[in-house]
Structures are given as structure tokens and as C-alpha cells.
């Protein structure tokens, strides 16, 4: 993670409702469609902002794990498995996910990267064109609705004058190669009717992978176009497409990891792999109705196709109720979010934001055997007979209200509520002897209030108290398989609810920020992994859990182009009721969550010439199962980078190199929670290297 300057970033209050960058100057980014513009210092919530330019400084630009490891409360781990995405959790929410992102609400330019059921993914984020990434933790994330243990909002750069074209490339260990092209620009300054801004980027990434059977290739395209219609309104078009083909190496037992961490024996036997194709587009209209009123409407639609081959032996698949070892999904999703903001007086200055959010998703899910018989013997890795055929629908309608009250010069109150309603309907089209009609439906409804009080001790020191209630429904994937191995949906799985209280302090220190947050979250009916085997996972409700912790962060810039960033997270996440069958797990640590995380970096980064830096990351041990009988050991990693940036008239050339895991530490990058065969461990590489180049030309 790189350092950002606090004075350079401003946020919409509480980061509510997916802000977008509207205009910019040298010191601030002006954010539209938000109740008011506030700094990170003045936001009464635990929030971190990482600047896009800092994210790209001497990094591969392949994964968010390169640049977000210093965000307190955020546990981001690279599985070394591009078939399953990063493992990402905020304050422990999302740690159970065996693939993709769970328990966290993701947005890219206002378009949800999280489906209506709560399942998300980061593979469509182009780091080459990111303006910034905002990470919200704590009670106010509930105002985003379902699956909001935390919120991550990614904003694409808004094109500015002069027009610029940039080519970039990175080559690293294990045959990893990324290259891309980006064009940005604008006509006018964005304030006059007819002014246009644009950002278009495309990237290709290929790798052999650190482990056996872990190669991947990804093609990604991203575009953002803005048109100033008149002095009061703007129209923005967002487009994104990603195409991934990735082998899946799977997990290893402890003995296998120690013997050879690069091996993937079952993956090669079953030829486990995944393909993903996703295309989406969005349209945002923003209008200033008066000096006191603003409105905006965001519409989007997309489609996603996935095919996955799993490592399931032939014998279980012969059961008439088994869904097979190949999954094919076709998803179509769309949504609309409309909101109105009013600033007025009710004895004190007050701001109201109200709106309505609607999302829906249709899914055609089919299952096939992952083998074909040849002379009576199975040949794995081939699509066989149809074993599952269903159409699933999920949709939500959420009205919301947020208010902000300036009670006095030093005291302010923020309060909001969202009523979240989620419906699920499954229609079974595969009815055979031994496999009956498993159609079913479910609905979930919950009021989600949140509020905070902020007091300004001085102009540079604020303290706050916040509380709220969160809500997390099962995803379609979590509903898809029953723990008893029978056919049909796991409709007995209930949504979880959580209550959070948080106190925090933020202090500006020169050109930097020191922040501290203390919190406690109690959850009922926590959704946890019941079993995981062969790439297939079933889930259950765990009763009560508690997360309590502390987050400390310090970001500072010094004279002479030196930058320092440091953070520490302590998170005690435990079961408050028994979730195990054969022993009492009450009081056990929840798996997949590190109790301690630390990060520190220092860099010398002038505008041009030589630059260099180092960073260190500590990850505490992570339990792999509910019984706490298996765990991934703690580790500390150190990285170094250096480069040279050359500016000559309209040309900028940046050449750099880096080494990661400098001391060649052997470690487990992530765990597969409650893997039934003890294959918990997903190893990460030892010392590895990379070199990169960026060339930009400005048409002035």
C-alpha cells in the first residue's frame, strides 16, 4: 500500500450512496450527488482512502492486494488462484468466502460489483485507471443494504486536459505479464455545456502461476464518458468488460504444503478450471435543481457467464440427487438508484438525502458430470451428462433516508435508515426418478438504522460515537447446496443480523492523519461454512458471534518528498454459541480471521528522478476450522521497490523494479475454511521479482 495525502482527498459524508468524482483541481476532488463535501478527518466513521496514483507506484497493477494491505480492518489475501478471486474481509465479514467476495458491498463507479444476493468480485477493476478506492468500515456500511459488513467504493479517473495516452507493462516471476493502454482527456474544463471528458483503458494479463495448474489469462476493458448537458446537469456513461480463463490448483493438506507447496495433485487429475465472461454498462444523470436541491439517477445492466470444473470423484456424482461436478451459470442483472438531496434549516442546518434502490438478477444454473466414460473408466475434466437445471431469481427494493444535523459549531448528528427487502425464487427444471421437484422461494426483510455523534475537540481533532444494525442474506451460491447431500436448495439457511457500536478519534498532524477506532459487533445467525470439499461448499447458521477490536492508522508526508504509512489491527472474533457437532466450540476463534495485522512503509518519491521505498506486512495466525485444530502460521513479509521517472516536454517515462518477500518466507497466503479433507492451505510464493515501464504522452 502506498501513502496518500490527507489534504488531497475529500469524501462525501459517510460515503453513502456511491459517490462519483465530478470535477477536480490540484488539491481536492469535488464529489457530487452527496449531502455535503467533507474531509476524511470530518467523516464520523472509520474510513480509509487510497489514491490511484499511489496504488500504481512501482506495482504490477494486477491485484488489489498489492495496494490495500495497509488499510486497517481490511484483510486482503492473494490466493494465488485466479479462478477464485482475492480473499477479502472487513472486520472479519467475508472471511468464510471460498471464492469471490462475500459480506462486503463493492461498487465501481456507482455500479454494484456485488450482486443483489451479496456475492461480489473484484476481477473487473482496472487498476490502471482507478482514481481512488474508499473503504468504509463500521455501522454506516449498513446503509448500503444487504451484505454490508463493510463497503469498498472504486472510482475511475475523470478525464482532464490535456489529452494523454499511456502505455504500461509489467513482467514478473512465474511468467506473469501485464500490458495495457489508457487514453484520457477532456474538451473544456467540465463546467460549460457540451464539455466532454473521457477515460478509456484496456489491459491483458497472463501468468503460468506460482503453483502447478494455476495459469491464467485475463482481458479487461474499462471506459468512462462524461458530458456536460447544461450548467446544472451532467450525464455519465460507464462501460466494463472482463474475460478470464483460469486453472484452479485447489487447497493442500499441511503435509502436502510442507512437502511441496507448488503441487496441485487433484487439480491436475480433474483438470479443475473456471471461465468468466462479464459485460456491463451504466448511465448516471446528475442535476442541480437549485442552490439547496440536487438529484441523481443511476441505471445499469450486465450479464455474466461462468463455467467451473470441480474435483469431485465419479462415485458421489452417480447418486441420482447429486448435481454433478461442472457448474454453468448465466446471469443477467440490472438496477436503478434514484435519490434527492435537500439542504435547509430546521432550527439548525440540516441535510436530507432520500432515495429508492431496486436491483434484480436472473440466473440459469446447470450442473453436469465432470467426466465421460471411456471403456468404463472416467475421463475427468470433460462435461458429461446433465445433472441440474434450474432458474433462480433474486431481487430487492430498498428505500433509504439519511439526515445530517449541525447541532452546534462543534457538535453534529448523522442518522439514517434503510428498509431492505430481498426476495428469492427458484424453479427446478430437472425432475427425474430419485431427484424430485426442488423449487422453492424465500424472502427477507429488515430495518437498518445507523447514527453517529461527532464532536470537534479542535479544528484538527474530532471524536465520534456511532452505532448501527447490519443485515446479510444468503447468496444464491450459499443456498445452492444442502449439507445432507440431497438435491435442492438450502432454504433453511437464514439471514444474519449484526449490531455494531464504535468510538473513534481522528487527528490532523501537519500533512498527515492519525486515526483510532474501537468497536464491537454482535451477530445473530452468522452464516458460516458447514463443509467444503472438491470446490463445493455448504453453509449453516452459527448462532451468535462477537467481533471486537481496535484499528490504528497513521499516514504522513514529510518535507523532502518522504512518506510514511503505518497501521495495526487487533480483531478478536469468536463464537458465542456452539457450532460444532462433536465438541463444544463456544469461545473458539472464528476461522479465516487474523487476530493481529500490521503494516508499515516508508518511501522517497519526488516528482521526477530516482525514487525508492520499502514496506513490511505482518499477518497473525489464522484458524482454518471451527474446532481450532488447524491453522495457518503467522508471517512477516518485506518488499522493496525503486525506479526512475523522467519528464521531458510532453513525454513521461517511468521505469521501475521490485522484489517481494525479500527474505524468502514460506507461508500460507489464505485458507479454505472448514475444508472437509483437511486441504485448508493455499500457499504463496517465496522471493519474487518484477520490472515495469510506463510511458505517457500529453497532447499539448
Curated annotation (Swiss-Prot):
The keyword Isomerase does not apply. GO terms for cellular component: cell outer membrane; membrane; transmembrane transporter complex. A motif (TonB C-terminal box) lies at residues 680-700. Keywords: Cell outer membrane, Membrane, Receptor, Signal, TonB box, Transmembrane, Transmembrane beta strand, Transport. The keyword Transmembrane applies. Residues 39-157 form the TBDR plug domain. InterPro entries: Plug_dom, Plug_dom_sf, PqqU, TonB-dep_rcpt-like, TonB-dep_rcpt_b-brl, TonB_rcpt_b-brl_sf, TonB_sidphr_rcpt. It is a multi-pass membrane protein. One of its GO terms (biological process) is intracellular monoatomic cation homeostasis. The chain crosses the membrane at residues 132-136, 150-160, 162-171, 177-186, 195-204, 220-227, 233-241, 280-288, 295-301, 335-344, 350-358, 398-405, 411-419, 447-456, 464-468, 500-509, 511-520, 549-556, 563-570, 597-604, 611-617, 637-647, 651-659, 689-697. It holds the Pfam family TonB_dep_Rec_b-barrel. PQQ is a small molecule and it may also pass the outer membrane without PqqU, through porins. However, this diffusion-dependent uptake process is rather inefficient, which may be a disadvantage when only low amounts of PQQ are present. Belongs to the TonB-dependent receptor family. Mediates the TonB-dependent high affinity transport across the outer membrane of pyrroloquinoline quinone (PQQ), a redox cofactor required for the activity of Gcd and Asd dehydrogenases. The uptake process is energised via the TonB-ExbBD complex. Not involved in the transport of an iron-containing substrate under laboratory conditions. This is Pyrroloquinoline quinone transporter. The gene is pqqU.
Amino acid at each position: 500500500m502506498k501513502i496518500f495525502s490527507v489534504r488531497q482527498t475529500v469524501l462525501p459524508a459517510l460515503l453513502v450512496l456511491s459517490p462519483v468524482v465530478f470535477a477536480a483541481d490540484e488539491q481536492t476532488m469535488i464529489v457530487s450527488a452527496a449531502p455535503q463535501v467533507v474531509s476524511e478527518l470530518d467523516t464520523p466513521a472509520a474510513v480509509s482512502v487510497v489514491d490511484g496514483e499511489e496504488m500504481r507506484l512501482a506495482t504490477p497493477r494486477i491485484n488489489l492486494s498489492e495496494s490495500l494491505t495497509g488499510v486497517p480492518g481490511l484483510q486482503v489475501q492473494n490466493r494465488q488462484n485466479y479462478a477464485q478471486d482475492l480473499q477479502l474481509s472487513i472486520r472479519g465479514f467475508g472471511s468464510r468466502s471460498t471464492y469471490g467476495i462475500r459480506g462486503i458491498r463493492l461498487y465501481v463507479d456507482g455500479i454494484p460489483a456485488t450482486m443483489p444476493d451479496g456475492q461480489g468480485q473484484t476481477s473487473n477493476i482496472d487498476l490502471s485507471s482507478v482514481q481512488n478506492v474508499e473503504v468504509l468500515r463500521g455501522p454506516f456500511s449498513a446503509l448500503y443494504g444487504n451484505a454490508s459488513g463493510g463497503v469498498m467504493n472504486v472510482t475511475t479517473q475523470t478525464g482532464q486536459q490535456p489529452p494523454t495516452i499511456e502505455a504500461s507493462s509489467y513482467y514478473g516471476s512465474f511468467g506473469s505479464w501485464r500490458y495495457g493502454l489508457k487514453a484520457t482527456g477532456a474538451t473544456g474544463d467540465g463546467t460549460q455545456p457540451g464539455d466532454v471528458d473521457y477515460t478509456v483503458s484496456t489491459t491483458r494479463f497472463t501468468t503460468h502461476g506460482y503453483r502447478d495448474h494455476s495459469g491464467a489469462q485475463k482481458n479487461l476493458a474499462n471506459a468512462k464518458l462524461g458530458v456536460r448537458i447544461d450548467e446544472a446537469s451532467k450525464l455519465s456513461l460507464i462501460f466494463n468488460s472482463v474475460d478470464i480463463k483460469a486453472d484452479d490448483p485447489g487447497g493442500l493438506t499441511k503435509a502436502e504444503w510442507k512437502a511441496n507447496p507448488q503441487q496441485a495433485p487433484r487439480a491436475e487429475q480433474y483438470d479443475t478450471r473456471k471461465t468468466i465472461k462479464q459485460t456491463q454498462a451504466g448511465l448516471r444523470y446528475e442535476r442541480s435543481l437549485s442552490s439547496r436541491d440536487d438529484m441523481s439517477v443511476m441505471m445499469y445492466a450486465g450479464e455474466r457467464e461462468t463455467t467451473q470444473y470441480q474435483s469431485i470423484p465419479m462415485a458421489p456424482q452417480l447418486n441420482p440427487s447429486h448435481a454433478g461436478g461442472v457448474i454453468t451459470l448465466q446471469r443477467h442483472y440490472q438496477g436503478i438508484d434514484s435519490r434527492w438531496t435537500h439542504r435547509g434549516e430546521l432550527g439548525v442546518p440540516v441535510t436530507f438525502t432520500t432515495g429508492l434502490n431496486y436491483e434484480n438478477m436472473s440466473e440459469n444454473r446447470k450442473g453436469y458430470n465432470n467426466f465421460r466414460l471411456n471403456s468404463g473408466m472416467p475421463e475427468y475434466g470433460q462435461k458429461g451428462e446433465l445433472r441440474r437445471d434450474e432458474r433462480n431469481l433474486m431481487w430487492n427494493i430498498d428505500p433509504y433516508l439519511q439526515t445530517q444535523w449541525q447541532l452546534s459549531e462543534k457538535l453534529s448528528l448523522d442518522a439514517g435508515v434503510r428498509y431492505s427487502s430481498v426476495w428469492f425464487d427458484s424453479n427446478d427444471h430437472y425432475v427425474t426418478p430419485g431427484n424430485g421437484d426442488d423449487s422453492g422461494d424465500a424472502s427477507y426483510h429488515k430495518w437498518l438504522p445507523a447514527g453517529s455523534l461527532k464532536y470537534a475537540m479542535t479544528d484538527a481533532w474530532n471524536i465520534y460515537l456511532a452505532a448501527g444494525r447490519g443485515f446479510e442474506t444468503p447468496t444464491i451460491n450459499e443456498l445452492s447446496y444442502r449439507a445432507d447431500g440431497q438435491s435442492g436448495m438450502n432454504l433453511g439457511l437464514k439471514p444474519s443480523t449484526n449490531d455494531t457500536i464504535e468510538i473513534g478519534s481522528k487527528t490532523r498532524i501537519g500533512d498527515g492523519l492519525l486515526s483510532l477506532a474501537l468497536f464491537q459487533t454482535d451477530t445473530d445467525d452468522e452464516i458460516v461454512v458447514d463443509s467444503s470439499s472438491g470446490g463445493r461448499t455448504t453453509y449453516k447458521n452459527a448462532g451468535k458471534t462477537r467481533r471486537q477490536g481496535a484499528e490504528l492508522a497513521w499516514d504522513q508526508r514529510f518535507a523532502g518528498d518522504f512518506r510514511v504509512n503505518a497501521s495495526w489491527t487487533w480483531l478478536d472474533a469468536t463464537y458465542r454459541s456452539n457450532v460444532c457437532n462433536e465438541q463444544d466450540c463456544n469461545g473458539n476463534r472464528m476461522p479465516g480471521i487474523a487476530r493481529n495485522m500490521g503494516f508499515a512503509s516508508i518511501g522517497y518519491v519526488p516528482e521526477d528522478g530516482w525514487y525508492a521505498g520499502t514496506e513490511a506486512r505482518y499477518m497473525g495466525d489464522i484458524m482454518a476450522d471451527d474446532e481450532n485444530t488447524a491453522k495457518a502460521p503467522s508471517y512477516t513479509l518485506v518488499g522493496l521497490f525503486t525506479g526512475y521517472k523522467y519528464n521531458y516536454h510532453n513525454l513521461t517515462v517511468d521505469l521501475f523494479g521490485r522484489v517481494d518477500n525479500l527474505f524468502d518466507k514460506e507461508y500460507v497466503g489464505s485458507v479454505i475454511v472448514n475444508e472437509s479433507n483437511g486441504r485448508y492451505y493455499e500457499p504463496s510464493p517465496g522471493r519474487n521479482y518484477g520490472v515495469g515501464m510506463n510511458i505517457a504522452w500529453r497532447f499539448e
